[in-house]
């Protein structure tokens, strides 16, 4: 008579910002957070770490009941931080199935749960009129006189 081990609750979520993609795995635990297999204390600089901890602070005790492992790739450090932040918030809402937490996140910052579709405009070819290679809408300045 061998007791069957209860299946552990595991949640997989993603977060995106600009070109950065964060995949998070959330399991019951003691509040450890790893980004690319390194503790959160080693991530970026202090303002980025504080920004990353916002969903955890808003969640309160729930953040101390889960371990979060995040894998982030592409984009820059700020985009990666925002993607990881979104993945943490989505994962905590899905893990707790708490509508109040979801509403709290939506009131605090909608981008914690909702994808931001804004993108950089691609460069247009230099089609006459002095179009520059510096930007998609930049043109050579013309004098009126």
Question: Residue ranges of each PLM-predicted region?
Answer:
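Beta-rich strand-turn-strand
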Residues: 78-85
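Structured, basic alpha/beta domains of bacterial-type, RNA-associated proteins
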Residues: 4-12, 16, 22-27, 31-73, ...
């Amino acid at each position: 008579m061998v007791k069957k081990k209860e299946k552990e609750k595991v949640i997989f979520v993603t977060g995106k910002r600009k070109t950065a993609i964060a995949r998070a795995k959330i399991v019951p635990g003691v509040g450890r957070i790893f980004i690319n297999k390194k503790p959160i204390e080693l991530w970026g600089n202090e303002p980025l770490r504080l920004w990353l901890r916002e969903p955890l602070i808003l969640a309160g005790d729930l953040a101390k009941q889960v371990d979060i492992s995040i894998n982030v790739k592409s984009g820059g450090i700020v985009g990666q931080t925002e993607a990881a932040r979104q993945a943490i918030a989505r994962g905590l809402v899905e893990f707790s199935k708490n509508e109040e937490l979801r509403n709290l996140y939506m009131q605090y910052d909608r981008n914690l749960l909702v994808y931001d579709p804004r993108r950089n405009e691609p460069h247009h070819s230099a089609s006459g009129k002095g179009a520059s290679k510096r930007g998609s809408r930049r043109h050579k300045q013309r004098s009126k006189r």
